[in-house]
UniProtKB/Swiss-Prot annotation:
Its main location: cytoplasm. It comes from Clavibacter sepedonicus. GO terms for biological process: translational termination. It is found in: Cytoplasm. Responsible for the release of ribosomes from messenger RNA at the termination of protein biosynthesis. May increase the efficiency of translation by recycling ribosomes from one round of translation to another. This is Ribosome-recycling factor. The keyword Protein biosynthesis applies. Belongs to the RRF family. One of its GO terms (molecular function) is ribosomal large subunit binding. Keywords: Cytoplasm, Protein biosynthesis. GO terms for cellular component: cytoplasm. Pfam families: RRF (PF01765).
Amino acid sequence: MTVAEVLADARDRMGKAVEAVKEDFGSVRTGRANPALFQKVMVEYYGSPTPLGQLASMNNPEARTLIVTPYDKTALKEIEKALVNVPNLSATVGNDGEMVRFTLPELTEDRRKEFVKIVRGKAEEGRVSVRNIRRRSKDELDALKGEVGDDEVARVEKELEALTKTHTDQVDDALKRKETELLEV
């Protein structure tokens, strides 16, 4: 592996770590019904678990309401059953024969603060992941020290530090946005 490959690999993995954190943030409920909340919901469809997104379209007519319209009406009951069993949402689910209406209750102040703690934990996991990638990349650079000059290694280590700072700042920015979204009444 060359010095350039180590740097490119670190950049790629750090970017993926930040994206994973943002994806995790999407699964944390705010006061709004968001289709991202249901990305991991699996529906028992003809005997096999199928992601909800493959069976139905979702839209938000109102902030706390999500309408799920199945492509195949025979899946309506199974979709409703899967939505009723979504943990930590305590929502009302109604089926009118054409679509499933999913309404979230208002979040209490305590629940909002609890979600902020969860999001902060996920952000810290993301920052740790980015720092671990930096450490692994530095170890790879140390292995190359005999083949590459010390100046080149020092330059790339400096770039790694800048990359790490950029990506941890991206995690922090995403955290601030999510906290603002959560605490918004």
